[in-house]
Amino acid sequence: MRLKTPMKAIHKNLLLTRTGDVWAYYRIKSNSIPMQNKEKVESYKKKWQHLFEEITSYEDFHLMMYPSEYELEKRFKDLETDIAADAMDVARYYNEETVRLLEQRLGRLTKYDFILGVKLKSSLVNISVELKDNILSFFNTATDTVVKMLGWEQNVSTSFFEKYEEVEETLANIMASVRGERLSETEMTYINRYHFVRGLKHQTNEESEIKDVRSITNTIIDPTDPSVLHLHSDQDEGYSAFVVIDEFLHNMSESDLFYEAQSLPFPVEVQMKIQTESKSITKPALNLKRQQLKEEQKEQQSTGDRSDVSTVTSATMIRHLQDEIKKEDVHVMNWLSVIVVHGKTKKECVGKATIVKRHLKGAGITCRLPVADQLNLFYKMLPGEKLDITDKNWIQKTTQDGVAESLFAVNSDIGSKIGFFLGWVDRFQEHTDLESAIMSSRDFVLFHPFLANQQLKGSKTRSPHCLITGDTGNGKSYLAKLIFNYISMLNIKSLYIDPKKEMRKWIQRVLNDEYIRENFPLYIAHLEKYNYITLDHENTHNWGALDPISFLPPMKAKELVQVIFEQVYDFKGKDDINTAFLRATSEVIDAKQKGEQVGSLDIIRKMQSHPEEAVQKAGDYLNEVVSDSILKLCIHDGSNPALSLEKRITILEVENMDLPDHAERLENYTISQLKSSAVMFALGKFCELFGMNQDEQTVEFIDEAWIFTTSQQGKKVERQMRRIGRSYNNAEYFISQSTKDALKEEDSGNFGVAFAFDEPNEREEVLKWMNMEVTKDNKKMMESMFQGQCLFKDYYGRTSKISIECLFEEWQGALKTVEKKAVAYAEEKYL
């Protein structure tokens, strides 16, 4: 093999080789498909089988999966446009810490890109033989430089490439069916340069701007060490090794080469060169092979031996292949595939190659690390290089469906491209505990909590709402608090409804921790911005926190006052009393407008001092009903501040609520339940008002969401809040043990994002809701999830199992939900 770089010129997404071939290159947008969804995976493979059948006549192909830079710092910089001004320092610090901690754990932060190259059919291009000969003659005598001798060469190249525009346009339309997009000229430059700087330090932007072949190939490649190549660039040096695919199982189904390679604990490349075999070669070769196998079987039988199992299997496969290639669309494809690993030392590189071989062996794929063919493989895998008749070693022969089984351009991406770190993808593998699941993953998850209604390209939803469900103790509240911590850094007004009244307790412990105060002052200063409201009627400071007179505008205040009082007093048939009540309400609201310190309790006082005895008695009754009850939260004299709508971060604690069961009839409500329902109306109105400012983004977290689903009033409140979310920039985080709490028929499309922790009694419903197939394997997968693991369905409709992790030790105290006792640590200590 002549070891020469095939590339001669680049024009847009086209590459011209020394031999006069023109290749077109496309980036294939990856698809995230859970491997547990067998039907979706098979459907995807069928689509690629049909693609290869459609483009078989193009003859030569190049599949490439490579680890591109994730550019996390750049993504966090873009995220800063959403950060609140008063949280910029703390957000920037934690984003920098995220980058540092992830790089410490993973090394280079990468994501896999997928490139498909196709050699264009020159037979379809109208180029005079003389022009092509002139160009090839020029290339054979001229320097390798594309730009230095720009004058004539560039002009010829451009006119030459223009001849291919029509045939490339046809191919580009076919590529669109698998989400393929043309590479730009700078991307083409980088894809070629990448092969010479793989695993070495380099700046993608700088390498993409190179304009001549000599600079693109400006790396010393030293093949003197067996099994590896030593690469020296102008910035760095390192080692690469090409691990070649040698054998598959007879049945290649579910070999999933490209997908399997992604789950390795370090970044790798997968390169595959494919060439269509002419049927005029395939048919005689199969006939000859079949004849040989027949003679082998005859010979074995003549000596009294049974036919070898391998001989019988081979004969069956040959017969099957002969039947298959009778179909017009089916061809044999010859292909050569390698996994490329990198390392700073030869030892590291060979060690990674060994791990690759062991890992793929588990998927039924046998690999080899060639000792003396590393340089040949390096040049064979360059863009524009094709297989030829001299390539005999490690060539695989399959039909198009065999190539499709490699599962090109599928990954396990989930979440958003810009956002905060939330955890790790778990590719549905079995682990001993949560920590091992986290440590075995390279796929980290970013999440931006407020993107769904931003008209994202490719998004499957316009709903900003989020559902977090699962059994008690699996991590719902932990996840909700983690997201709330991140949201508190965004320029979003946030409200967390905390019925267990636990957040303040844990946060206060963090604020009182001398070590954290001394070492993490930015985080302490941020936590001190949290505003707490406690709905506890036993605390006099909370009286009037939800008084409509205090926090609502006049019209809405009057309406809500009526609703609250009607919960505990029947005005029907008592027009005089009702008139006095309404008049007193108007007078108190007018007084409030004039700046006087008044509240709903003043309505009762006015009724008590009314000249009519019936009104006085009604006032006395209402006073007794309100006295020492939960209604003190809604009915007070205005001396305490109401819930603040001005604070950016509010935690609203709810205590001592006595709400009826959702199936209970209204006439069976106890007086205590009626009072709690009245408070629910007030709470809902506050949330509704909270989310109704179109000039600002707002979010509410509703922990223990049974509060809103146990009464008709609560359901009404919650539905109204969600409608506000669709109309305004408002998102609701609904945190509940039961998926059924949230997923009524009319509500199923109302949640754009969902996190589902395991709930043994609802696995089937959860799988359906999360776009997962309801199978035994998937139910078992849910059963085996650890505390802190959940299914995550994102804005794009993708679903994956993820392990939640908070990277920052100082945050853990504020995210706690239970106190771990000494005996629990002792339990874990013993083998």
UniProtKB/Swiss-Prot annotation:
This is Uncharacterized protein YddE. One of its GO terms (cellular component) is cell pole. Gene3D superfamilies: P-loop containing nucleotide triphosphate hydrolases. GO terms for biological process: unidirectional conjugation. It holds the Pfam family AAA_10. It comes from the Bacteria. PANTHER family: SLR6007 PROTEIN, UNCHARACTERIZED PROTEIN YJGR-RELATED. GO terms for molecular function: ATP binding. Keywords: ATP-binding, Nucleotide-binding. ATP binds at G470, D471, T472, G473, N474, G475, K476, S477. Residues 285-311 are annotated as: Disordered. It comes from Bacillus subtilis (strain 168). InterPro entries: ATPase_SAG2001_prd, P-loop_NTPase, T4SS_component.
